[in-house]
UniProtKB/Swiss-Prot annotation:
Gene that encodes it: cptp
Membrane topology: Peripheral membrane protein
Source lineage: Eukaryota, Metazoa, Chordata, Craniata, Vertebrata
Main location: cytoplasm
Protein role: Mediates the intracellular transfer of ceramide-1-phosphate (C1P) between organelle membranes and the cell membrane. Required for normal structure of the Golgi stacks. Can bind phosphoceramides with a variety of aliphatic chains, but has a preference for lipids with saturated C16:0 or monounsaturated C18:1 aliphatic chains, and is inefficient with phosphoceramides containing lignoceryl (C24:0). Plays a role in the regulation of the cellular levels of ceramide-1-phosphate, and thereby contributes to the regulation of phospholipase PLA2G4A activity and the release of arachidonic acid.
InterPro entries recorded: GLTP_sf (IPR036497), Glycolipid_transfer_prot_dom (IPR014830)
Binding sites annotated in the UniProt record for an N-acylsphingoid base 1-phosphate: 57, 61, 107, 111, 151
One GO MF term attached to the UniProt entry: phospholipid binding
The protein's name: Ceramide-1-phosphate transfer protein
Native source organism of the sequence: Xenopus tropicalis
Catalytic activity: N-(hexadecanoyl)-sphing-4-enine-1-phosphate(in) = N-(hexadecanoyl)-sphing-4-enine-1-phosphate(out); N-(9Z-octadecenoyl)-sphing-4-enine-1-phosphate(in) = N-(9Z-octadecenoyl)-sphing-4-enine-1-phosphate(out)
GO cellular component: cytosol; endosome membrane; Golgi apparatus; nuclear outer membrane; plasma membrane
SUPFAM superfamilies: Glycolipid transfer protein, GLTP
């Protein structure tokens, strides 16, 4: 069983994203970021194929980044800041078109970053919702406020139709393998600030270097 097929654990995701942040929250350890994402992939896969349009792409992006970490310049990819500095100084990032370096680390992390925003919004909505809330509505709202802005119409339409098949809030909480509803809500409350910090810091670094619209 691969690392993305194991049973989902919300606590492991919390630990990974908490461990991401170093140097007084001024940098991100890429390996821990990827570990957090592996946990999120397990979360999506545990719900069947509904989120496969995101999870499959995330698995591909994780593999690209792990190849960079294992490569000859792996140390340059250890943190987010060192990766950005290395790729920009080495002309590995094309800000105008994709053809030259389609799989740069900067572009790859950006795609994960955009998807993280959707999951961040959705999980926060789940945390603050009530038992009768429609998860399809919560997920669609989160999607429309994030990933939908980067998807063509056909994918947006397919995604929102797929969301209609989402299970109940209680089923989502059971998948998280934490315990009672109250315990899940409490752990989400502990986890989401770290996910938000990681997202916000990544967004800030990419904004500083004009990387948020990489093709």
């Amino acid at each position: 069983m691969s690392s993305t097929e194991e049973k989902f654990s919300l606590k492991e995701v919390l630990v990974s994203f908490k461990s991401c942040l170093v140097d007084d929250d001024q940098d991100i350890i890429v390996e821990q970021y990827l570990n957090g994402w592996k946990g999120l992939v397990r979360f999506m896969n545990s719900l069947g194929t509904i989120f496969s349009f995101v999870s499959k792409d995330a698995v591909t992006k994780i593999q690209i980044m792990e190849n960079y970490l294992a490569g000859t310049n792996g140390e340059r990819y250890r943190t987010l800041q060192s990766m950005v500095e290395h790729e920009l100084s080495s002309d590995l990032v094309d800000l105008t078109k994709r053809c030259n370096n389609p799989d740069s680390g900067c572009r790859t992390i950006l795609r994960l970053h955009r998807a993280l925003r959707w999951l961040q919004l959705f999980l926060e909505k789940l945390r603050t919702s009530n038992e009768d809330s429609k998860t399809s509505t919560l997920c669609t709202e989160a999607y429309n406020d994030s990933l939908a802005n980067f998807h063509p119409w056909i994918i947006r339409k397919t995604a929102t139709v797929a969301f209609l098949a989402l299970p109940t809030r209680n089923t989502f909480f059971e998948v998280m393998n934490v315990g009672t509803t109250e315990e899940v809500v409490a752990m989400l409350g502990e986890s989401m600030p770290y996910v938000t910090k990681v997202y916000d810091f990544t967004h800030e670094i990419y904004s500083q270097h004009n990387l948020l619209e990489l093709p």
